[in-house]
Amino acid sequence: MRSLLLHLSESKRLAPLMMKNPVSRRVARRFVAGDNLDDAVAAARGVNQARQTASLDMLGENVTDEASARRSAENYLAIFDRIAQERLEANVSLKLTQLGLDLGTALCEELVGKIVTHAARYSNFVRVDMEGSAYTERTLGVVKRVRAQHENVGTVMQAYLYHTEQDVRELLEIGCRIRLCKGAYNEPPTVAFPQKSDVDANYVKLMKILLPSGIYHGIATHDPAMLQATKEFAREKQIDREQFEFQMLYGIRTDLQKQLVREGYRLRVYIPYGTDWFPYFMRRLAERPANLTFFLRSLVPRRS
Ligand code: FDA
Protein backbone atom coordinates (compact mmCIF):
# COMPACT_ATOMS: atom_id res chain seq x y z
CA MET A 1 0.00 0.00 0.00
CA ARG A 2 2.85 2.39 0.89
CA SER A 3 4.51 1.78 -2.49
CA LEU A 4 1.21 2.20 -4.34
CA LEU A 5 0.45 5.51 -2.64
CA LEU A 6 3.98 6.77 -3.27
CA HIS A 7 3.68 5.71 -6.89
CA LEU A 8 0.34 7.55 -7.17
CA SER A 9 1.91 10.64 -5.57
CA GLU A 10 3.75 11.14 -8.87
CA SER A 11 0.61 10.78 -11.01
CA LYS A 12 0.01 13.81 -13.21
CA ARG A 13 -3.57 12.60 -13.85
CA LEU A 14 -4.65 12.04 -10.27
CA ALA A 15 -3.19 15.32 -8.98
CA PRO A 16 -5.72 17.73 -10.58
CA LEU A 17 -8.65 15.46 -9.67
CA MET A 18 -7.63 15.30 -6.01
CA MET A 19 -6.79 18.97 -5.83
CA LYS A 20 -10.27 19.90 -7.10
CA ASN A 21 -12.08 17.47 -4.83
CA PRO A 22 -13.50 19.31 -1.77
CA VAL A 23 -13.12 16.26 0.49
CA SER A 24 -9.44 15.71 -0.29
CA ARG A 25 -8.86 19.46 0.09
CA ARG A 26 -10.46 19.33 3.53
CA VAL A 27 -8.47 16.26 4.63
CA ALA A 28 -5.23 17.74 3.24
CA ARG A 29 -5.77 20.81 5.45
CA ARG A 30 -4.86 18.60 8.39
CA PHE A 31 -1.27 18.54 7.08
CA VAL A 32 -1.10 21.82 5.13
CA ALA A 33 -1.47 25.24 6.76
CA GLY A 34 -3.44 26.80 3.89
CA ASP A 35 -3.24 28.07 0.34
CA ASN A 36 -1.09 31.16 0.81
CA LEU A 37 1.70 32.81 2.77
CA ASP A 38 -0.77 34.58 5.08
CA ASP A 39 -2.02 31.15 6.19
CA ALA A 40 1.54 29.95 6.80
CA VAL A 41 2.38 33.11 8.76
CA ALA A 42 -0.72 32.61 10.95
CA ALA A 43 0.29 28.97 11.57
CA ALA A 44 3.87 30.00 12.39
CA ARG A 45 2.61 32.64 14.81
CA GLY A 46 0.60 29.95 16.62
CA VAL A 47 3.61 27.66 16.69
CA ASN A 48 5.83 30.44 18.07
CA GLN A 49 3.25 31.23 20.76
CA ALA A 50 3.54 27.58 21.81
CA ARG A 51 7.32 28.18 22.26
CA GLN A 52 8.20 26.23 19.13
CA THR A 53 10.08 27.44 16.06
CA ALA A 54 8.92 26.91 12.48
CA SER A 55 10.22 26.08 9.03
CA LEU A 56 8.05 27.36 6.18
CA ASP A 57 7.77 25.28 3.03
CA MET A 58 6.01 26.65 -0.04
CA LEU A 59 4.75 23.42 -1.60
CA GLY A 60 5.78 22.57 -5.15
CA GLU A 61 8.17 20.17 -6.83
CA ASN A 62 9.43 19.07 -10.24
CA VAL A 63 8.82 22.30 -12.14
CA THR A 64 9.13 21.84 -15.89
CA ASP A 65 10.11 25.32 -17.10
CA GLU A 66 12.63 27.97 -16.14
CA ALA A 67 10.01 30.68 -15.57
CA SER A 68 8.32 28.56 -12.86
CA ALA A 69 11.67 27.88 -11.18
CA ARG A 70 12.50 31.62 -11.16
CA ARG A 71 9.02 32.42 -9.81
CA SER A 72 9.53 29.92 -6.96
CA ALA A 73 12.85 31.56 -6.11
CA GLU A 74 11.22 35.05 -6.05
CA ASN A 75 8.56 33.68 -3.72
CA TYR A 76 11.22 32.35 -1.37
CA LEU A 77 12.92 35.76 -1.24
CA ALA A 78 9.55 37.27 -0.29
CA ILE A 79 9.05 34.62 2.41
CA PHE A 80 12.29 35.69 4.11
CA ASP A 81 11.17 39.35 3.94
CA ARG A 82 7.86 38.43 5.51
CA ILE A 83 9.45 36.30 8.26
CA ALA A 84 11.56 39.33 9.20
CA GLN A 85 8.63 41.79 9.04
CA GLU A 86 6.49 39.55 11.22
CA ARG A 87 9.41 38.82 13.55
CA LEU A 88 8.72 35.11 13.32
CA GLU A 89 11.04 32.49 14.77
CA ALA A 90 11.15 30.65 11.47
CA ASN A 91 13.46 29.52 8.71
CA VAL A 92 12.65 28.03 5.32
CA SER A 93 12.67 24.55 3.79
CA LEU A 94 12.71 24.13 0.02
CA LYS A 95 13.02 21.44 -2.62
CA LEU A 96 15.55 21.69 -5.43
CA THR A 97 13.18 20.29 -8.06
CA GLN A 98 10.98 23.32 -7.32
CA LEU A 99 13.98 25.43 -8.28
CA GLY A 100 14.62 23.74 -11.60
CA LEU A 101 16.90 20.80 -10.71
CA ASP A 102 15.24 18.75 -13.49
CA LEU A 103 16.16 21.51 -15.97
CA GLY A 104 19.82 21.69 -15.04
CA THR A 105 22.08 21.99 -12.04
CA ALA A 106 23.42 25.42 -13.05
CA LEU A 107 20.01 27.12 -13.01
CA CYS A 108 19.10 25.47 -9.71
CA GLU A 109 22.41 26.41 -8.10
CA GLU A 110 22.05 30.03 -9.23
CA LEU A 111 18.58 30.25 -7.64
CA VAL A 112 19.56 28.52 -4.39
CA GLY A 113 22.58 30.84 -4.20
CA LYS A 114 20.27 33.88 -4.48
CA ILE A 115 17.93 32.59 -1.79
CA VAL A 116 20.73 31.68 0.61
CA THR A 117 22.42 35.09 0.05
CA HIS A 118 19.10 36.84 0.74
CA ALA A 119 18.51 34.74 3.89
CA ALA A 120 22.02 35.60 5.11
CA ARG A 121 21.08 39.31 5.14
CA TYR A 122 18.54 38.41 7.82
CA SER A 123 20.89 35.93 9.53
CA ASN A 124 18.38 33.30 8.60
CA PHE A 125 18.78 29.73 7.38
CA VAL A 126 17.78 27.65 4.36
CA ARG A 127 17.13 23.93 4.68
CA VAL A 128 17.30 22.00 1.44
CA ASP A 129 14.87 19.08 1.71
CA MET A 130 16.00 15.74 0.31
CA GLU A 131 13.88 14.20 -2.44
CA GLY A 132 14.05 10.77 -4.11
CA SER A 133 17.43 9.02 -4.43
CA ALA A 134 17.73 10.03 -8.11
CA TYR A 135 18.38 13.55 -6.79
CA THR A 136 20.61 12.83 -3.76
CA GLU A 137 23.99 13.31 -5.40
CA ARG A 138 22.98 16.44 -7.30
CA THR A 139 21.33 17.91 -4.19
CA LEU A 140 24.48 17.34 -2.15
CA GLY A 141 26.57 18.90 -4.91
CA VAL A 142 24.43 22.06 -4.99
CA VAL A 143 24.33 22.34 -1.20
CA LYS A 144 28.10 21.92 -0.85
CA ARG A 145 28.91 24.46 -3.55
CA VAL A 146 26.43 27.06 -2.29
CA ARG A 147 27.58 26.44 1.27
CA ALA A 148 31.17 27.19 0.29
CA GLN A 149 29.96 30.81 -0.25
CA HIS A 150 27.42 31.11 2.59
CA GLU A 151 27.23 28.84 5.62
CA ASN A 152 23.52 29.42 6.33
CA VAL A 153 22.39 26.41 4.35
CA GLY A 154 21.98 22.81 5.40
CA THR A 155 20.28 19.72 4.10
CA VAL A 156 18.48 16.52 5.01
CA MET A 157 19.77 12.96 5.34
CA GLN A 158 17.48 9.95 5.02
CA ALA A 159 18.15 6.96 7.28
CA TYR A 160 16.61 4.49 4.80
CA LEU A 161 19.44 4.92 2.25
CA TYR A 162 22.50 2.64 2.54
CA HIS A 163 24.74 5.48 1.36
CA THR A 164 23.61 7.98 3.97
CA GLU A 165 26.25 7.18 6.59
CA GLN A 166 29.02 8.07 4.15
CA ASP A 167 27.19 11.23 3.05
CA VAL A 168 26.69 12.24 6.69
CA ARG A 169 30.40 11.85 7.41
CA GLU A 170 31.30 14.00 4.38
CA LEU A 171 28.82 16.72 5.36
CA LEU A 172 30.13 16.76 8.93
CA GLU A 173 33.66 17.30 7.63
CA ILE A 174 32.56 20.62 6.15
CA GLY A 175 30.48 21.55 9.22
CA CYS A 176 27.11 21.28 7.48
CA ARG A 177 23.92 21.27 9.54
CA ILE A 178 21.81 18.16 8.93
CA ARG A 179 18.16 17.27 9.46
CA LEU A 180 17.93 13.53 10.05
CA CYS A 181 14.72 11.84 8.88
CA LYS A 182 13.75 8.29 7.93
CA GLY A 183 12.93 9.03 4.27
CA ALA A 184 9.58 9.44 2.53
CA TYR A 185 10.01 8.23 -1.06
CA ASN A 186 9.57 4.97 -2.93
CA GLU A 187 13.06 3.47 -3.07
CA PRO A 188 14.19 0.07 -4.40
CA PRO A 189 16.03 -2.41 -2.13
CA THR A 190 19.18 -1.77 -4.17
CA VAL A 191 19.52 1.67 -2.53
CA ALA A 192 17.39 1.58 0.63
CA PHE A 193 16.66 -0.74 3.57
CA PRO A 194 13.33 -2.45 2.79
CA GLN A 195 12.66 -3.31 6.45
CA LYS A 196 11.43 -0.64 8.86
CA SER A 197 13.47 -2.20 11.71
CA ASP A 198 16.68 -1.66 9.70
CA VAL A 199 15.71 1.94 8.90
CA ASP A 200 15.06 2.56 12.60
CA ALA A 201 18.38 0.98 13.61
CA ASN A 202 20.23 3.11 11.05
CA TYR A 203 18.36 6.22 12.27
CA VAL A 204 19.65 5.64 15.81
CA LYS A 205 23.16 4.92 14.52
CA LEU A 206 23.18 8.17 12.50
CA MET A 207 21.71 10.19 15.38
CA LYS A 208 24.64 8.98 17.49
CA ILE A 209 27.07 10.27 14.86
CA LEU A 210 25.33 13.63 14.53
CA LEU A 211 24.72 14.66 18.11
CA PRO A 212 28.33 14.65 19.39
CA SER A 213 29.57 16.51 16.27
CA GLY A 214 29.27 19.96 17.86
CA ILE A 215 27.13 21.11 14.91
CA TYR A 216 23.48 22.14 15.41
CA HIS A 217 21.35 19.38 13.85
CA GLY A 218 17.63 18.59 13.57
CA ILE A 219 16.29 15.22 14.69
CA ALA A 220 13.13 14.95 12.60
CA THR A 221 10.74 12.19 13.62
CA HIS A 222 7.39 11.48 15.27
CA ASP A 223 8.52 8.04 16.38
CA PRO A 224 8.50 7.78 20.19
CA ALA A 225 11.28 5.15 20.05
CA MET A 226 13.57 7.52 18.07
CA LEU A 227 12.75 10.39 20.42
CA GLN A 228 13.53 8.24 23.46
CA ALA A 229 16.81 6.98 21.98
CA THR A 230 17.85 10.57 21.23
CA LYS A 231 16.98 11.83 24.71
CA GLU A 232 18.82 8.94 26.37
CA PHE A 233 21.91 9.33 24.20
CA ALA A 234 22.03 13.11 24.79
CA ARG A 235 21.72 12.56 28.53
CA GLU A 236 24.42 9.86 28.57
CA LYS A 237 26.86 12.01 26.54
CA GLN A 238 25.91 15.21 28.38
CA ILE A 239 24.83 16.91 25.20
CA ASP A 240 22.90 20.01 26.12
CA ARG A 241 19.27 20.49 25.00
CA GLU A 242 20.30 23.71 23.26
CA GLN A 243 22.78 21.86 21.03
CA PHE A 244 20.15 20.23 18.81
CA GLU A 245 16.45 20.44 18.00
CA PHE A 246 13.67 17.99 17.37
CA GLN A 247 11.56 18.59 14.28
CA MET A 248 8.05 17.44 13.40
CA LEU A 249 5.54 18.03 10.65
CA TYR A 250 2.58 20.40 10.98
CA GLY A 251 -0.54 18.55 12.13
CA ILE A 252 1.24 15.32 13.11
CA ARG A 253 1.56 14.16 16.73
CA THR A 254 0.87 17.58 18.20
CA ASP A 255 0.62 15.82 21.58
CA LEU A 256 4.28 14.82 21.31
CA GLN A 257 5.20 18.30 20.04
CA LYS A 258 3.76 19.89 23.18
CA GLN A 259 5.29 17.26 25.43
CA LEU A 260 8.81 17.87 24.10
CA VAL A 261 8.46 21.61 24.76
CA ARG A 262 7.18 20.92 28.27
CA GLU A 263 10.24 18.74 28.85
CA GLY A 264 12.49 21.63 27.81
CA TYR A 265 13.55 20.41 24.36
CA ARG A 266 13.73 22.60 21.29
CA LEU A 267 11.11 21.77 18.68
CA ARG A 268 10.73 23.09 15.13
CA VAL A 269 7.49 22.52 13.24
CA TYR A 270 7.68 22.13 9.46
CA ILE A 271 4.80 24.17 8.02
CA PRO A 272 3.90 23.46 4.39
CA TYR A 273 1.48 25.70 2.54
CA GLY A 274 0.31 26.37 -1.00
CA THR A 275 -2.04 24.96 -3.59
CA ASP A 276 0.39 22.36 -4.92
CA TRP A 277 -0.17 20.00 -1.97
CA PHE A 278 -0.95 16.71 -3.76
CA PRO A 279 2.44 14.86 -3.61
CA TYR A 280 3.08 16.04 -0.04
CA PHE A 281 -0.39 14.87 1.01
CA MET A 282 0.08 11.46 -0.64
CA ARG A 283 3.39 10.94 1.17
CA ARG A 284 1.62 11.65 4.47
CA LEU A 285 -1.11 9.12 3.59
CA ALA A 286 1.56 6.56 2.71
CA GLU A 287 3.25 6.96 6.09
CA ARG A 288 0.27 5.85 8.10
CA PRO A 289 -2.47 3.40 7.04
CA ALA A 290 -4.92 5.08 9.46
CA ASN A 291 -4.61 8.32 7.45
CA LEU A 292 -5.69 6.50 4.32
CA THR A 293 -8.64 4.84 6.10
CA PHE A 294 -9.72 8.24 7.44
CA PHE A 295 -9.43 9.77 3.98
CA LEU A 296 -11.37 6.96 2.28
CA ARG A 297 -14.12 7.14 4.93
CA SER A 298 -14.39 10.90 4.37
CA LEU A 299 -15.01 10.27 0.68
CA VAL A 300 -18.10 8.16 1.42
CA PRO A 301 -21.16 10.40 1.89
CA ARG A 302 -22.73 9.98 5.35
CA ARG A 303 -26.34 8.73 5.62
CA SER A 304 -28.57 11.13 7.47
P1 FDA B 1 7.39 6.46 11.50
O1 FDA B 1 6.98 6.52 10.08
O2 FDA B 1 7.93 5.18 12.02
O3 FDA B 1 6.17 6.92 12.38
C1 FDA B 1 6.22 6.90 13.79
C2 FDA B 1 4.88 7.37 14.33
O4 FDA B 1 4.69 8.75 13.98
C3 FDA B 1 3.68 6.66 13.73
O5 FDA B 1 3.38 5.48 14.42
C4 FDA B 1 2.61 7.71 13.88
O6 FDA B 1 2.13 7.77 15.21
C5 FDA B 1 3.36 8.99 13.61
N1 FDA B 1 3.30 9.38 12.19
C6 FDA B 1 4.29 9.31 11.27
N2 FDA B 1 3.89 9.78 10.08
C7 FDA B 1 2.59 10.13 10.25
C8 FDA B 1 1.62 10.68 9.40
N3 FDA B 1 1.87 10.96 8.12
N4 FDA B 1 0.39 10.92 9.91
C9 FDA B 1 0.09 10.66 11.20
N5 FDA B 1 1.00 10.14 12.07
C10 FDA B 1 2.22 9.88 11.60
N6 FDA B 1 11.48 12.95 4.26
C11 FDA B 1 12.29 13.03 3.16
O7 FDA B 1 12.45 12.05 2.46
N7 FDA B 1 12.91 14.22 2.87
C12 FDA B 1 12.78 15.33 3.65
O8 FDA B 1 13.37 16.37 3.35
C13 FDA B 1 11.95 15.24 4.80
N8 FDA B 1 11.76 16.30 5.64
C14 FDA B 1 11.10 16.13 6.82
C15 FDA B 1 11.03 17.16 7.75
C16 FDA B 1 10.47 16.96 8.99
C17 FDA B 1 10.45 18.08 9.99
C18 FDA B 1 9.93 15.68 9.32
C19 FDA B 1 9.34 15.41 10.68
C20 FDA B 1 9.93 14.68 8.39
C21 FDA B 1 10.48 14.89 7.14
N9 FDA B 1 10.50 13.89 6.18
C22 FDA B 1 11.30 14.02 5.07
C23 FDA B 1 9.59 12.72 6.33
C24 FDA B 1 10.28 11.53 6.98
O9 FDA B 1 11.23 11.00 6.12
C25 FDA B 1 9.26 10.43 7.35
O10 FDA B 1 8.63 9.97 6.19
C26 FDA B 1 8.20 10.86 8.32
O11 FDA B 1 8.68 11.74 9.29
C27 FDA B 1 7.60 9.64 9.07
O12 FDA B 1 8.62 9.01 9.79
P2 FDA B 1 8.74 9.05 11.38
O13 FDA B 1 10.16 9.31 11.73
O14 FDA B 1 7.77 9.99 11.95
O15 FDA B 1 8.49 7.54 11.84
Regions inferred by a protein language model and the residue ranges of each:
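Positively charged, amphipathic and often flexible ligand-engagement surfaces
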Residues: 1-304
